[in-house]
Amino acid sequence: MTTHNEAWQSHFTGRPTPDLTLHPRHLSVVLDEAAGTAPRREALRFQNTRMTYAELREHAERFAAALRRNGVQPGDRVAIMLPNLPQTVVAFWGVMKAGATAVMTNPLYRETELTRHFRDAGVRVLITLDILWQHIGPLLETLALERVFVTSVDDALRPPLNWLYALKRW
């Protein structure tokens, strides 16, 4: 019988060597490379929405430009408080391309966790979901945010699902 360690170790040919050469680069280069080598390959899928690597890079670059127009500077900390949506991926890569730091934030956090998390990280800007506003709105002064970007689930959907989502919320 093969042990757990033997099973995965059989895939490795040797030990890592201390002379391993690392090539440090900015994380946003990874998206650029993926979009350059496989622009039409599907990068993400959500309900009836599909996005290629080229489209993801384009959305990320546009969002990065919007962040910069709204005062986000390299090194700023931007909280991304979203569930698993295409906007989460676009926001992350947009923050990277703007040179800022993404502070991934659990959308289930409430007042105590948000206040501690944002203060500890030095968050200046927030990207969140409209249905979370009821928890964020009352904390705006406490959190000392300079900007808040709000999106909706239906922003990630194509017809007819975006229409149905809007009707359901109404």
Q: Where would I find each of the regions flagged by the language model?
A:
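Residue-level signature of the cytosolic catalytic core of signaling kinases
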Residues: 23-27, 128
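Conserved AMP-binding/adenylate-forming core of the ANL superfamily
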Residues: 21-23, 32, 40-85, 89-93, ...
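Structural core segment of the AMP-binding/adenylate-forming
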Residues: 69-70, 97-170
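Short low-complexity stretches enriched in small and charged residues
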Residues: 1-4, 80-83, 102-109
